[in-house]
C-alpha cells in the first residue's frame, strides 16, 4: 500500500513537471510571435538636391557660387578635380531604393556641364517617424520638405 501511494505521488509529480515544461516551452515559442514586424526606418544619405536647387545652376557659375547654392559636394573625383558629384540615396524601409545624382563639371573655376541622373521633379518622401509601418501616401508629414515644426 505504501508503494502504491509512493508510485501515485511520483506520477502526480511527473505529470506536474510535464505540464510545467510543456507550458514553459509553449510560452517561449509564443513569445517570439508578434503582430508587428521588425521596425525599419527610411535611411537617407548624401546631399539632398531639389529640382529648385538644380534649376538655379547655370553654366559659367564659379565654384564658390555653386557651393553657396548646393553645399559641399558629396564626392570630388580624386583624379579629376574638375568634377563634383552630389549624390542622394534614399533606402526606403518598406520599398525600394531611390537614388539621384547630379554631376557638375568645371573648366577652370567655372561650371561647364550639368548632368542629372534620377527623378528631380518630385521631393523624396521619408516615412513618418511616429508610424510603425509604411508611409501612407496621403500623409504629408512623411515628406521632409513639407514638414513644419508645429505639425503634431
Swiss-Prot record:
* TM regions (residue ranges): none
Q: Origin, by domain of life?
A: Bacteria
What Gene Ontology terms describe what this protein does at the molecular function level? protein-macromolecule adaptor activity
Q: How does it sit in the membrane?
A: Lipid-anchor
Biological process terms in GO annotation: Gram-negative-bacterium-type cell outer membrane assembly; protein insertion into membrane
Pfam families on file = BamE (PF04355)
InterPro entries named among the record's database cross-references:
BamE, BamE-like, BamE_dom
Lipid-anchored residues (N-palmitoyl cysteine): 33
Span list, region Disordered? 114-152
N-terminal signal peptide: 1-32
What are the lipidation residues for S-diacylglycerol cysteine?
33
State its location(s). Cell outer membrane
What UniProt keywords are attached to this protein's entry?
Answer: Cell outer membrane, Lipoprotein, Membrane, Palmitate, Signal
What's a single GO CC term here? Bam protein complex
**Is the keyword Signal in the record?**
yes
Is the Signal keyword given for this protein? yes
> What is this protein's function per UniProt?
Part of the outer membrane protein assembly complex, which is involved in assembly and insertion of beta-barrel proteins into the outer membrane.
Sequence similarity: Belongs to the BamE family.
Q: How does it assemble?
A: Part of the Bam complex.
Under which name does UniProt file this protein?
A: Outer membrane protein assembly factor BamE
Q: Which organism is it from?
A: Halomonas elongata (strain ATCC 33173 / DSM 2581 / NBRC 15536 / NCIMB 2198 / 1H9)
* Gene designation: bamE
Amino acid at each position: 500500500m505504501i508503494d502504491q501511494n509512493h508510485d501515485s505521488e511520483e506520477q502526480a509529480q511527473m505529470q506536474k513537471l510535464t505540464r510545467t515544461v510543456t507550458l514553459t516551452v509553449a510560452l517561449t515559442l509564443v513569445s517570439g510571435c508578434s503582430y508587428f514586424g521588425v521596425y525599419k526606418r527610411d535611411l537617407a544619405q548624401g546631399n539632398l538636391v531639389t529640382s529648385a536647387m538644380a534649376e538655379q545652376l547655370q553654366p559659367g557659375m564659379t565654384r564658390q557660387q555653386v557651393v553657396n547654392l548646393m553645399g559641399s559636394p558629396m564626392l570630388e573625383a580624386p583624379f579629376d578635380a574638375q568634377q563634383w558629384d552630389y549624390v542622394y540615396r534614399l533606402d526606403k524601409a518598406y520599398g525600394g531604393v531611390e537614388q539621384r545624382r547630379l554631376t557638375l563639371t568645371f573648366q577652370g573655376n567655372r561650371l561647364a556641364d550639368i548632368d542629372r541622373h534620377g527623378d528631380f521633379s518630385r521631393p523624396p518622401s521619408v516615412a513618418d517617424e511616429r508610424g510603425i509601418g509604411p508611409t501612407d501616401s496621403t500623409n504629408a508629414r512623411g515628406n521632409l520638405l513639407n514638414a513644419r515644426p508645429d505639425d503634431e
